[in-house]
């Protein structure tokens, strides 16, 4: 379950923003990473734990504790933000840019290539989504292990290679010059995992119930445990990716 939750959390933004921190923070990298971890790991953990411990049936039920109009507004705003407004387009464009754009003919019609890739990408996503009962198998047992294997190879190869310039002597850029912690803090929030945790938490609850755990207290404890393990692992990945990016300048 923790592996599945990690796979749900770790999307395009989880590679973009730690990489940017490594490239721009320079010698202020560690204070920037601390800020990144607070909002990129700490807030998602609190979100998953809140949904599990509240024993709510979903985001709408949780936000209904304020009142129903607020619940409708907050639920719609959150799903639009982590869905069609920001996160969904980012997943397709980053996958295309990182995975295909560099090997396609540079004199070709990139907009057409992106359109075709996007259609194929979201058709595949739709096929997975139509079988929610298989999400633990597809994400937790198949996609996530392959992703971690390839990412691990990339991180190890980069970290064992000597850096051209020591990170401690690299000048920071942009907001990392004066406010590295705050800039990293904002970058961690930009992953949008703090918002996504409120949506993913109910998926964890449903999967735990499908595994035969029905007692509310046990469901809450197992949800919190899944959140802790997945977020700790995500934090380790953030540190590794940031360090890798810093060494590859």
PLM regions: where:
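TM-loop-TM module centered on a large, flexible mid-protein loop between adjacent transmembrane helices
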Residues: 58-64, 237-249
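Hydrophobic transmembrane alpha-helices that form the core helical bundles
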Residues: 20, 71-105
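Extracellular loop-to-transmembrane helix junctions
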Residues: 22-47, 66-75, 113, 233-236
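Select transmembrane alpha-helical segments in multipass membrane proteins
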Residues: 1-5, 30, 68-82, 113-119, ...
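Juxtamembrane transmembrane-helix boundary signature
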Residues: 35-63, 75-89
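Transmembrane helix-boundary motif of multi-pass solute transporters/channels
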Residues: 1-36, 46, 55-62, 204
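Hydrophobic, membrane-embedded alpha-helices of multi-pass small-molecule transporters
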Residues: 2-10, 80, 157-164, 173-244
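Membrane-interface loop-to-helix entry segments
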Residues: 130-158
């Amino acid at each position: 379950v923790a592996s599945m939750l990690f796979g749900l959390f770790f999307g395009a933004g989880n590679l973009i923003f730690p990489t940017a921190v490594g490239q721009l923070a320079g010698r202020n990298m560690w204070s920037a990473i601390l800020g990144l971890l607070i909002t990129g790991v700490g807030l998602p953990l609190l979100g998953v734990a809140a949904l599990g411990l509240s024993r709510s049936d979903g985001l709408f039920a949780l936000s209904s504790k304020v009142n129903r109009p607020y619940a409708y507004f907050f639920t719609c705003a959150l799903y639009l933000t982590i869905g069609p407004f920001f996160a969904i387009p980012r997943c397709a464009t980053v996958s295309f840019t990182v995975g295909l754009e560099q090997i396609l003919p540079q004199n070709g019609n990139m907009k057409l290539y992106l359109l075709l890739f996007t259609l194929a990408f979201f058709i595949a996503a739709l096929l997975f989504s139509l079988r929610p009962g298989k999400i633990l198998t597809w994400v937790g047992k198949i996609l996530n292990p392959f992703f971690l294997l390839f990412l691990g190879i990339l991180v190890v190869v980069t970290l064992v290679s000597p850096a051209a310039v020591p990170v401690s002597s690299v000048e920071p850029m942009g907001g990392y010059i004066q406010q590295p912690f705050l800039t990293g803090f904002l970058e961690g929030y930009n992953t949008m995992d703090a918002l996504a945790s409120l949506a993913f938490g109910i998926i964890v609850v449903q999967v735990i119930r499908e595994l035969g755990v029905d007692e509310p207290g046990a469901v809450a404890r197992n949800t919190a445990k899944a959140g802790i393990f997945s977020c700790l692992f995500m934090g380790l990945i953030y540190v590794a990716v940031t360090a890798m990016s810093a060494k590859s300048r």
